[in-house]
From Swiss-Prot:
Protein name: RNA polymerase sigma-54 factor
Pfam annotation, one family: Sigma54_AID
Organism (species): Treponema pallidum (strain Nichols)
Keywords: DNA-binding, DNA-directed RNA polymerase, Nucleotidyltransferase, Sigma factor, Transcription, Transcription regulation, Transferase
Gene3D superfamilies: Homeodomain-like
Lineage, top ranks: Bacteria, Pseudomonadati, Spirochaetota, Spirochaetia, Spirochaetales
DNA-binding region listed in the record: 356-375
Its job: Sigma factors are initiation factors that promote the attachment of RNA polymerase to specific initiation sites and are then released.
Length: 475
């Protein structure tokens, strides 16, 4: 008896891979990619601005002396509002996420201990032999929890930490990101990075040379690394997927901190307050406007028979469509952030509410991975201040009861209306208020003062936040 089975799956193609890459590009990288695409494709051109077409000069007009004084005050406020840079490292970022995971306390404690052994790349700073001997000397109850603790760290952002080298990191990232897809090329990527990394990298160090697409295609087919025969285009897609992974995940944190130290930033999103609420706009200044050249196709002879021209046409239309989709998606996510964080824009950091990427994804109808790609390296300007979009995603604060039973997070306790950023801001204000009186507040006293403001916060949480704020603690 014959059976008809209908299966729905995501099939990888060049356009999908390129679109995913465009979503996560920063403003500067996007401009570079657009200019590079226009140089390669004759069917694309950059539309000049109206000022360039008319030949008029672009300048800021300040009408009277009062307006000039206001502009000077705004610039002075911009200089004074530059925050004191506090550089985090990969260990601090991972340790913060472990605190909110739903696991047994023994697994969380093991994970925190292993995180302390990581270097700035996110790799273990000791050799595998020493690590194995150390784990072998632990009690049996702890040894049984070691795989769970390592797997927990590897799933945290940035993914791929708690390994010994970049090859293991890439294999872990590929498994976590691509294992849920049924497309054979995803399976091939996992197989390559897990069992046959020597085909991609010549040594334990990063290979500077490029991988030969033709040679890799032959090796994959001859060794049967994919369930189906792969072509050169398939291998190009495989290499693009691998390029999405980060060989040194710890550098993601250091690079983000380095970007934060730049004095001048070009925001991707502009927020302005009006009498009717907040207005969200995409900052198009400095980003080239790409258009499709219909006249080129009309004057080209035998355009339908020219396969090269048809390929350029397909790439041009795809790029214009993906840039439009990127702009719409960024605008939708920015509007959603403003919707959830309107208290922050009205009253400051003390009113920043807890927000997860899952909440934004649910409201916009997007996937969590798409939201994560969009907010990466994107900046928002409100007044004279700049904020990273990731700044608005802040976890909630744990109460004393939750701290005692961390394995029941999200199950037996209601969600807290206070975020980590808002509580840290309130703690810094409390410390500043008593500093002039030469009074030292203990962690327990700060927890009591926060409780009087309606914030149930554990003493250990206060101690952790004071350490991040670099303020001395007196128990």
């Amino acid at each position: 008896m014959q059976q008809l089975v209908q299966q729905q799956r995501l099939v990888l193609n060049q356009r999908l891979v390129h679109g995913l890459c465009l979503l996560q590009l920063s403003r500067g990288d996007l401009k570079t990619e657009v200019l590079r695409a226009v140089q390669r494709n004759p069917l694309l051109e950059i539309r000049p601005s109206s000022a360039r077409r008319t030949g008029k000069a672009c300048y800021l007009s300040l009408g009277d002396r009062r307006e000039r004084m206001r502009a000077r005050d705004r610039f002075q406020q911009l200089l004074e509002n530059q925050p004191d840079k506090q550089v985090d490292n990969i260990r601090a970022v991972l340790r913060e996420q472990v605190f909110y995971q739903k696991h047994e306390a023994i697994v969380l404690d093991l994970a925190c201990a292993f995180i302390q052994m990581l270097d700035d790349h996110g790799f273990f700073s000791i050799s595998p032999a020493i690590f194995q001997n150390m784990c072998g000397s632990m009690p049996t109850a702890l040894q049984e929890k070691i795989p769970q603790a390592i797997a927990l760290i590897q799933r945290l952002e940035p993914q791929g930490c708690a390994v010994f080298n970049f090859k293991e990191s890439l294999a872990v990232q590929a498994r976590l990101r691509f294992e849920r897809f049924s497309d054979p090329l995803y399976r091939c990527v996992i197989n390559l990075l897990t069992h046959h990394s020597e085909l991609l990298f010549c040594s334990d160090n990063m290979c500077d040379g490029r991988v030969s697409v033709h040679a890799l295609t032959t090796q994959i087919n001859s060794m049967g690394l994919c369930v189906q025969k792969v072509s050169s285009n398939d291998v190009k897609d495989i290499l693009l997927l691998i390029k999405e992974l980060h060989p040194f995940p710890g550098k993601c944190v250091s690079n983000a901190q380095r970007a934060d130290t730049n004095m001048l930033l070009e925001p991707d999103v502009l927020i302005t307050k009006t009498a009717h609420g907040f207005v969200t706009q995409i900052n198009c200044t400095g980003i080239p406007t790409v258009v499709f050249r219909n006249d080129y196709c009309m004057h080209s002879k035998a355009a339908e028979k020219n396969h090269a021209l048809k390929a350029c046409m397909h790439d041009a239309l795809s790029l214009v469509s993906m840039l439009s989709y990127r702009e719409r998606t960024l605008l939708d996510i920015a509007k959603t952030i403003v919707h959830y964080q309107c208290g922050f824009f009205d009253h400051g950091p003390a009113k920043l509410t807890p927000l997860r990427m899952t909440d934004v994804a649910h409201r916009t109808g997007l996937s969590v991975s798409t939201v994560s790609r969009i907010v990466r390296d994107k900046w928002l300007q409100y007044g004279s201040q700049h904020f990273s979009l990731r700044y608005f995603f802040s976890p909630r604060v744990l109460s004393t009861e939750e701290y005692r039973d961390r394995s029941s997070l999200g199950q037996n306790y209601p969600s807290s209306p206070h975020s980590k950023v808002s509580v840290k801001y309130r703690i810094s204000r409390l410390i500043q208020e008593v500093r002039t009186q030469r009074i030292s507040l203990s962690d327990r006293r700060i927890a009591q003062l926060l409780g009087e403001q309606g914030i149930k916060c554990a003493r250990r949480t206060v101690n952790k936040y004071r350490s991040e704020l670099r303020t001395c603690s007196s128990s």
